[in-house]
UniProtKB/Swiss-Prot annotation:
It comes from Protobothrops flavoviridis (Habu). This is Zinc metalloproteinase/disintegrin-like HR1a. GO terms for biological process: proteolysis. The disintegrin domain belongs to the long disintegrin subfamily. Keywords: Calcium, Cell adhesion impairing toxin, Disulfide bond, Glycoprotein, Hemorrhagic toxin, Hemostasis impairing toxin, Hydrolase, Metal-binding, Metalloprotease, Platelet aggregation inhibiting toxin, Protease, Secreted, Signal, Toxin, Zinc, Zymogen.
Length: 609
């Protein structure tokens, strides 16, 4: 029999509640001081690592005992993880530090099925946990007794800035709200989303700019600690999409910025993408890069990213302002921008999650959520299925400390078909929690035509028609996948002859103006479209070898889209240098009687199709 030595550090709850204190997380009103009690099972004679694979702490919150279970986040770093900084004379210095025995954990509260935790145990316990639906923060108090910790609700941290902060991505989907409304009503079940054998893996590089370096007192270790905490939370957030994020490299621009970081978020993103394509990708293989900067961008923007761009050499990037003293906030902003890279757009009012605000809200909430909305789940899976980004299919080599698989730890390990936790907590009906094998009767795990691990009945609608040009699809009864999307022929009149069908949609200029500018927008007068004959920055039809070609007179309604917002703004247009196609009239749009836009030319509908 294996003897187990139980090492227990017994400390009582410090009987004190404070009204206000300044902590690393900011000025906190109403906090509780506790001394966590750590219990660790160590096999007798075993060599104990500095940070165990699993740990357990007991303390009290609001006078009630809680047990915090922690498990080391072994997927935090890739095996070839590297760190790069620059000497004062500009020399690149790259190291490959040993990160196997790190101190970053995920966890849960015992007897609270909806609880989560993201904790650094490097110097005491620092991080956040969800308990009975409320978010709490914990961090060490710098008293003479170093084991004292403050525990407080997130809502008790004073606001850092009253002005609302926003993502700079503009909603450009010109179609009606109907698909979003329908998506918001979809119930995406756990078994449909599980994809246990098809996890996606994002190999992430984070670049901290020179302002970040100086913000943290030019101390590389402080920058690294901050980034590790952010990625630990980022990793936790994305597991709900069945995506694992591994940090493959951290680069700190300790001797000045290597791409242009300016007050314009759009210019900064463009320059960072060019640098990544030109330089970083040649030095380090990775899937996505995020620039973490301490600059205060113009306006209220604190983040920006390209949409549906994962794996693209230039555009699989995002920029994030290190806006808050709470790393949870910064991690949520980074999760938001990476969400754009994964094809997820901003939430509409019909989108919901298990919180007041979801991750893809355009406005960053003062109490940010760690959950993606139902709309985000649908958009993500649509992007994965339609665009099929290949770079995130390969699993990075992880920095595992070799240990036998443990059934019930919610990690899919060698020899397991599934792992949904203990029999008491497992919520995944396809999995036998006792054996970590799929039940023998399981027909499917995920897909539009999979429900409760079985194929949905033949004839069940799995893809509603999105317009009169589309055709609804139904399940076959013998496949988990919805049949291939079909639609009416291109060129068929639609919307009472205001448009012509194109790939299942009925594109008309009014819908595009509505999406760009809101309900008060209409299509501008014909005279506004004449600006497309100028061939300037915004008024043109197409680009050839980087040169903007003006529209021919008959093609002006196939170039830049012009909308009217009333007498004050009769010729409004949208233009952004990060994606110059946004704000152009869409292909297939009616541009005249029996004419549609094709290749930026207004041609006969019969010729186009």
């Amino acid at each position: 029999m294996i003897q187990v030595l139980l090492v227990t550090i017994c400390l009582a709850v410090f009987p004190y509640q404070g009204s206000s204190i300044i902590l690393g997380s900011g000025n906190v009103n109403d906090y509780e001081v506790v001394y966590p009690r750590k219990v660790t099972a160590v096999p007798k004679g075993a060599v104990q690592p500095k940070y165990e694979d699993t740990m357990q702490y007991e303390f009290k919150v609001n006078g009630e005992p809680v047990v915090l279970h922690l498990e080391k986040n072994k997927g935090l770093f890739s095996k070839d993880y590297s760190e790069t900084h620059y000497s004062p004379d500009g020399r690149e210095i790259t190291t490959y530090p040993s990160v196997e025995d790190h101190c970053y954990y995920h966890g849960r509260i015992q007897n609270d099925a909806d609880s989560t935790a993201s904790i650094s145990a490097c110097n005491g316990l620092k991080g956040h946990f969800k308990l009975q639906g409320e978010m709490y923060l914990i961090e060490p108090l710098r008293f003479s007794d170093s084991e004292a910790h403050a525990v407080f609700k997130y809502e008790n941290v004073e606001k850092e800035d009253e002005a609302p902060k926003m993502c700079g991505v503009t909603q450009t989907n010109w179609e009606s709200d109907e698909p979003i409304k329908k998506a918001s009503k979809l119930v995406v079940t756990a078994e449909q989303q599980r994809y246990l054998n098809n996890f996606r893996f994002i190999e992430l590089v984070i670049v901290a700019d020179y302002r970040m370096f100086t913000k943290f007192n030019s101390n590389l270790n402080e920058v690294k600690t901050w980034v590790y905490e952010i990625v630990n939370t980022l990793n936790e957030i994305y597991r709900y999409l069945y995506v694992r994020v591994a940090l493959v490299a951290l680069e700190v621009w300790s001797n000045g910025d290597l791409s242009s970081v300016t007050l314009s978020a759009y210019d900064t993103l463009d320059s960072f993408g060019e640098w990544r394509k030109r330089d970083l990708l040649k030095r380090k293989s990775h899937d996505n890069a995020q620039l973490l900067t301490a600059i205060d961008f113009n306006g209220t923007i604190i983040g920006l990213a390209h949409v549906a761009s994962m794996c693209d050499p230039k555009c699989s990037t995002g920029i994030v302002q290190d806006y808050s003293s709470r790393n949870l906030v910064v991690a949520v902003i980074m999760a938001h921008e990476m969400g754009h890279n994964l094809g997820i757009r901003h939430d509409r009012e019909n989108c919901t999650c298990h919180a007041n605000s979801c991750i893809m809200s355009a406005v960053i909430s003062d109490q940010p959520s760690k959950y993606f909305s139902n709309c985000s789940h649908v958009q993500y899976w649509n992007y994965i299925n339609d665009d099929e980004p290949q770079c995130i299919l390969n699993e990075p080599l992880r920095t595992d400390i070799v240990s036998p698989p443990v059934c019930g730890n919610e990690l899919l390990e060698v020899g397991e078909e599934c792992d949904c936790g203990s029999p008491a907590t497992c919520r995944y009906p396809c999995c036998d929690a006792a054996t970590c094998k799929l039940h023998s009767w399981v027909e499917c795990e995920s897909g539009e035509c999979c429900e409760q691990c079985r194929f949905r009945t033949a004839g069940t609608e799995c893809r509603a028609r999105r317009s009169e040009c589309d055709i609804a699809e139904s399940c076959t009864g013998h496949s988990a996948d919805c049949p291939t999307d079909r639609f009416h022929r291109n060129g068929q009149p639609c919307l009472h002859n205001f448009g012509y069908c194109y790939n299942g949609n009925c594109p008309i200029m009014y819908h595009q103006c509505y999406a760009l500018w809101g309900a008060n927008a209409t299509v501008a007068k014909d005279s506004c479209f004449e600006d497309n004959q100028k061939g300037n920055d915004y008024g043109y039809c197409r680009k050839e070898n980087g040169r903007k070609i003006p529209c021919e007179p008959q093609d002006v309604k196939c170039g830049r889209l012009y909308c009217s917002l009333g007498n004050q703004l009769p010729c409004r247009f949208f233009y952004t240098p990060t994606d110059e196609n946004i704000g152009m009239v869409d292909t297939g749009t009616k541009c005249g009687d029996k004419k549609v836009c094709s290749n930026r030319q207004c041609v006969d509908v019969n010729t186009a199709y």
